[in-house]
């Protein structure tokens, strides 16, 4: 059989898997890879082989961490050795899963090849069983679906999808619904909607729109289940969590808060947990809050939540402050040497100033000691 000229092994997909995907698209119009194999052998962008174990259709409840990215700034390239250590460390801290290529990964500053490399590096680092969600935000349906195929090939289990919002005023709710309908219908993996007005020109999906996206018949897979399986609400609305929890059973749809400082408030309203940047810095503490609440130890959970919320205030200014805090704390616990130099934001963005660095260390000192004790 002649090799398809469009097949590109450097993007991390085996030829056998590529051909299977083409056949499935022709016969069903969909590729739901988790329904094809009980396990999947993939070839990463780095040439190594790994196996991806099946995951539940809906992402597991708990704390997910949108991992930050390490760079060699002298060559403006990914520091995959440090990245691998970091992913491996996070996977052993009690987190429910990792988000690769979330906002905090600086995904929009990465090339398509670098995105695939990060996912395949994560899969190799955490093994076949640990859940990975991949951000595939882009400006068009076609771009998003291309990134979705790359993510599936590199070993992701779920997709985290922002609405296309470069043309903010033109991105009304009809456009948003159409976009998610098309993406969900053609996606190789289950889709988690990502609502973050701060990076989407103010585009803010209400709970009714999110529910309509999940219930759209076009999003329903051949197995009868919606391919839209959850939402991350970085808008910070506990009201949306409450309404969505009232609208969907947890086994059908997972509603995640987008920060950890309202984790308990979200859980009380029916959330599945959170996908939170703070978990980069203190993953054990954040996972501990969730675990205490689930065990019914509410007062202890609240006490730790309050301390964590105060510590989190020091990194609310953005990615640069979060990455500096990672360099101070979790990167050291992960055994990464000289992390500070490789955790500056990618150019043209700047590190936080010396004053902010002092504040971060002061405000986070107490929670840092708790993290070490866990």
Language-model segments: what does each one mean?
Residues 264-374:
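Structured C-terminal cap/extension of enzyme domains
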Residues 49, 54-65, 69-202:
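Active-site beta->alpha loop and helix N-cap motifs at the rims of alpha/beta catalytic domains
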Residues 124-130, 154-155, 187-189, 216-226, ...:
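Short helix-capping segments at alpha-helix termini
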Residues 197-307, 315:
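Catalytic alpha/beta core domains of metabolic enzymes, predominantly
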Residues 7, 15-18, 37:
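Aromatic (phenylalanine/tyrosine) cluster motif
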Residues 20-24, 30:
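Leucine-biased recognition of intrinsically disordered, low-complexity hydrophobic segments
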